[in-house]
From Swiss-Prot:
This is Protein FlaF. It comes from Caulobacter vibrioides (strain ATCC 19089 / CIP 103742 / CB 15) (Caulobacter crescentus). GO terms for biological process: bacterial-type flagellum organization. Pfam families: FlaF (PF07309). The gene is flaF. It comes from the Bacteria. Required for synthesis of the 25 kDa and 27 kDa flagellins and appears to be important for flagellin assembly. The keyword Lipoprotein does not apply. Keywords: Bacterial flagellum biogenesis. The keyword Translocase does not apply. InterPro entries: FlaF.
Length: 102
């Protein structure tokens, strides 16, 4: 389920990165969706009942904060989409590895 969600939001980021510069709605929608996904992950990692190792939880929360900052910079056209896409791809690889190990 998480893998599919990351695949969908990453595809939206890729599409937004190729959209015309004046297509602000596509950019905003993709960045906002990605930010919401990461925010939900961070919120879940902050819960005491979360079963992930503390170090991994802290890393996910840290990445979520970075995603928020970088997304704002992308909207200001100070940064590009590629780092957001790459991080999501790395998460997808980790999720695929977890599914293979199960």
């Amino acid at each position: 389920m998480e893998y599919r969600l990351f695949g969908q939001v990453t595809r939206a980021l890729m599409d937004a990165s190729q959209a015309p510069a004046d297509d602000i709605a596509t950019r905003i929608d993709a960045l906002d969706w990605n930010r919401k996904v990461w925010s939900a992950l961070a919120t879940d990692c902050a819960l005491p009942e979360n079963q992930l190792p503390m170090e991994l939880r802290a890393s996910i929360i840290s990445l979520s904060l970075w995603v928020g900052r970088h997304s704002s910079a992308v909207m200001r056209k100070e940064e590009d989409f590629e780092p957001l896409i790459e991080i999501n791809r790395m998460i997808m690889q980790g999720l695929a590895g977890r599914a293979d190990a199960a």
